[in-house]
Amino acid sequence: MMGFEWGFKPSSKITQSTVSSQGTGNVMIPTAGVKQKRRYANEEQEEEELPRNKNVMKYGGVSKRRPQPGSLIRGQPLPLQRGMELMNKNQLQQLLVDLMTKHPEIQQSVHTRVIGLDFSIQKCLDMLKQKSEAVYQSIPYNRSYESNKLDDYAFVRMKPQILEFLNCLVDFILDNIPPRLENLHASLKFLDICTELVIKLPRFELASNNYYYDKCIEQLSHVWCTLIEHVARDRIILLADNSSVWKSHMTRLQVYNEHSNGLLERPLQLFKSLDMGSPSAASSSTLSLQESIIYHHDTMTANENNNNSGSAATDSPFN
């Protein structure tokens, strides 16, 4: 009977030399030569498996494949168009201002594109109402604006919002009068609403804190006179339009003049000099209006000279 085979088949020579002829029964007894050959075979097998298991021993018994760099997907920023779609209005505006500051040569191109756009009057009014609301929201909670006696602390808190609103108002008015806008009715209506917004702003107890309001109303008075001059020169509008339209503007202007302590007296007198009756009356009223306009321009020029010679506030938007 044959014994165990330890992974290989022994040759006939080793079998003959390792089996005793008698006295041991039928059991094979391996000799020293068999043990040595088996040890050499085991060592060769271990040497073959050693490079294969090198990484396994190095990483604590866990074999890992090294990732190939070409097979990974790397993150990347958004394209310019997608990024701009996600930016809000303030971010886009700040980006444009920064670009024009760093590259002044593009300011003219941007300005040309902007003035070529046709912004509706309603859009301008919506913006003005937002900025007017910001003025009211900046009032300190412990002071009531209904009494028109806000203190110095309230003026310091509200000043940035007031200047922003008045600057925006002046810019929009200049963009909605001739020759930018040829429709005199639309210009007068827009100026009427803007005047009402300024008149209704909360005022301060100290007269010097109301300087920006008063200065703005003076400028609005000049704009009123300018539009009335355009109306007087266009006799077709004077004769064709219903007189109730002009009387409505005059009535509202009279209310504004009372609330502004007479700062709108000059355009009010020009309106009263208009006669919406017969053509002869209209022509005579035009002559009297022209005399008033000459006086108005002389007064406006004198005021501008006084402002330039005097010490005006450096942050005023109306100088």
UniProtKB/Swiss-Prot annotation:
Region of interest: Disordered: 33-76
Protein's name according to its UniProt entry: Tethering factor for nuclear proteasome STS1
One GO BP annotation of this record: proteasome localization
Cell location: Cytoplasm; Nucleus
Biological role: Involved in ubiquitin-mediated protein degradation. Regulatory factor in the ubiquitin/proteasome pathway that controls the turnover of proteasome substrates. Targets proteasomes to the nucleus and facilitates the degradation of nuclear proteins. Required for efficient chromosome segregation. Restores protein transport and ribosomal RNA stability.
Family matches, as Pfam families: Cut8
Species classification: Eukaryota, Fungi, Dikarya, Ascomycota, Saccharomycotina
Statement: the UniProt record of this protein carries the keyword Zinc-finger: no
Additional information: Present with 2120 molecules/cell in log phase SD medium.
Keywords noted in UniProt: Cytoplasm, Nucleus, Protein transport, Transport
GO molecular function: proteasome binding
CC annotations in GO: cytoplasm; nucleus
InterPro entries per UniProt: Cut8/Sts1_fam (IPR013868), Cut8/Sts1_sf (IPR038422)
Main location class: cytoplasm
Subunit structure: Binds the proteasome. Interacts with karyopherin SRP1 and proteasome subunit RPN11.
Family statement drawn from the similarity comment of this UniProt entry: Belongs to the cut8/STS1 family.
